[in-house]
Amino acid sequence: MNVLHIDSGILGEHSVSRRLTAAIVAQIKADRPDANVIYRDLVSERLQHLTGAQIMAPADLDGVDPALASDVRTGRQMLDEFLAADTIVVGAPMYNFSIPSQLKAWIDRLAVAGKTFRYTEAGPEGLAKGKKVIVASTRGGHYSAGPAAAMDHQEAYLRTVFGFFGITDVEFVRAEGLNLGADQKQFAIAEAEKTIAEGDVLRLAS
């Protein structure tokens, strides 16, 4: 089984989303010692945001500007990693009601017609069916219910874009209210880690 582990939290060792994705992957490895894990830290790797030059780059990169060619190859490799994965673990903190720009840059490299989706007479069709996505979702406030739920452009976006790719099995391990005091932060992390340890969310694609 192939597992793709993605981190996008910018707080390094202080990042709760990184703590949770590490726990998820550790649980997967405990349950499936044969799992092959590929790790991408989208912050330290400094993936470039999408440009017109990237989109227009030819399939054959011979003669292309070396910096552009390197960037395009990186994007293609990330797409290949995604397509090869059975389970994708994504650390996705909420920043300003949405996802980190680093994570959006990664998703932009995945959204390739003919690879993760295609257009048909009946409408778009996802081509990445059969995968499982587990998202470690962290938020400073509470956005899963109540009036603030309308501000959620994080989980809603991720469910939509992975669904567009054909992935219907998307689970969220959520830690909310992390900026509402030490007790609430400790409680939210403990509840998320309990969810991971109980394993229901980790019923994996194989």
Curated annotation (Swiss-Prot):
It is an enzyme of class 1 (oxidoreductase). Its cofactor is FMN. It holds the Pfam family Flavodoxin_2. Transmembrane segments: none annotated. SUPFAM superfamilies: Flavoproteins. Keywords: Flavoprotein, FMN, NAD, Oxidoreductase. It catalyses: 2 a quinone + NADH + H(+) = 2 a 1,4-benzosemiquinone + NAD(+); N,N-dimethyl-1,4-phenylenediamine + anthranilate + 2 NAD(+) = 2-(4-dimethylaminophenyl)diazenylbenzoate + 2 NADH + 2 H(+). The keyword Kinase does not apply. FMN binds at S15, V16, S17, M94, Y95, N96, F97, T138, R139, G140, G141. Binds 1 FMN per subunit. Gene3D superfamilies: 3.40.50.360. Its EC number is 1.6.5.-, 1.7.1.17. GO terms for molecular function: electron transfer activity; FMN binding; oxidoreductase activity, acting on NAD(P)H as acceptor; oxidoreductase activity, acting on NAD(P)H, quinone or similar compound as acceptor. It comes from the Bacteria. PANTHER family: FMN-DEPENDENT NADH-AZOREDUCTASE 1, FMN-DEPENDENT NADH:QUINONE OXIDOREDUCTASE. Belongs to the azoreductase type 1 family. Quinone reductase that provides resistance to thiol-specific stress caused by electrophilic quinones. Homodimer. This is FMN-dependent NADH:quinone oxidoreductase.
